[in-house]
Each structure stands twice: as C-alpha cells, then as structure tokens.
C-alpha cells in the first residue's frame, strides 16, 4: 500500500523545486508527492544486473540505459516517476537542458517490492502505457525467478508473457539482438 505524504495538490514545478532540496526521492503523481522506499540489496542487484546485460549498441543502433536516478516525465498524466531501469532506443528526449527527466523510453523495468508490487502492476503500468514510445514493460520479482514481460502489440493492446525459472530467456521486440 502506498502512503501519500502530502494532501496539498502541487504543480510539477513545485515538485521539482522540492526534489532539488530533498534528501530522499519521491515520485509525483498528478499533483501528489509519493515517497519512494529504500531498495533492498537484492533489488539493487537485480537492477544492476539487468542494466549490465542490456546491450548499448546493436549493429548501427545505439541505446541509452538509465538506472533508478533518472526521472521519467509523463505529460498526459502530469507525473514524474523513477523507474528502476529505462532503455531508450533513439536519442533521449529530455524535458529541459538540465537533462534530469526523459520522456521517451522504449523499455521500462521495475523490480517489485512487497510494498509497491500492486501499484507497479496496476496504476503505474496504466500511466506508463500512455507513453507513445514505450514498447515493453518488465516486472521482476525479487523473491523468486519470475518476470512478467508486457509487449505492446497494437494500439492499447499488450501481450503478457510470464517467465519462470532461472533459465528463462527474454526476447525484446524493440531491440533486435
């Protein structure tokens, strides 16, 4: 269950100003600030290992990979998130010259925690699905060998492939390996 830290509706500019001074990260969802809990060691291992396994270049195509500290701006819902891993299959589109938030990931991966698993699977994925460039969404279980891999197959259509076991392999549609 997510805990809302403030009840006052803020603007995105007010959130960014607060975030500059904050000692801990928080997400901004339609005017509300949501604190992000600290990540476990296993959560950090999974995030690091996934980002390390993703290629930065395939043929003549380059990819940008961002881990945990890069904000994602979703204009349609006026929300900022901190996905665990984002892959951008073209030039990153930043919200401004500070290059602190991107808008065009092709892949987003979230390592599930006990406290936020339901939110990541439902509400957050609902926000993410409005990103025009998003093609794939991974939900990684940190307690067992299980990954939910969502692939965009059409306008408002997503295909779920459930991967289980330590030898399961993922094929990404946006990344031709």
UniProtKB/Swiss-Prot annotation:
InterPro entries: Nuclease_put_TT1808, Restrct_endonuc-II-like, Uma2. Disulfide bonds: none annotated. To Synechocystis PCC 6803 slr1290 and sll0925. This is Uncharacterized protein sll1609. It comes from Synechocystis sp. (strain ATCC 27184 / PCC 6803 / Kazusa).
């Amino acid at each position: 269950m997510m805990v809302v830290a403030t009840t006052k509706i803020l603007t995105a500019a007010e959130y960014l100003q607060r975030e500059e001074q904050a000692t801990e990260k928080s997400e901004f969802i339609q005017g509300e600030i949501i604190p992000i809990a600290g990540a476990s060691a296993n959560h950090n291992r999974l995030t690091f290992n996934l980002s390390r396994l993703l290629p930065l270049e395939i043929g003549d195509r380059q990819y940008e990979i961002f881990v945990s500290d890069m904000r994602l701006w979703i204009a349609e819902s006026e929300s900022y998130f901190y996905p665990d891993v984002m892959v951008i299959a073209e030039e990153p589109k930043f919200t401004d010259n500070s290059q602190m938030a991107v808008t065009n990931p092709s892949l987003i991966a979230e390592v599930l925690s006990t406290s936020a698993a339901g939110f990541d699977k439902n509400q957050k994925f609902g926000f993410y699905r409005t990103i025009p460039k998003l093609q794939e969404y991974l939900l990684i279980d940190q307690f067992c060998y299980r990954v939910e891999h969502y692939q965009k197959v059409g306008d408002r259509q997503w295909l779920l492939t459930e991967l289980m076991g330590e030898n399961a392999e993922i094929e990404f549609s946006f990344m031709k390996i």
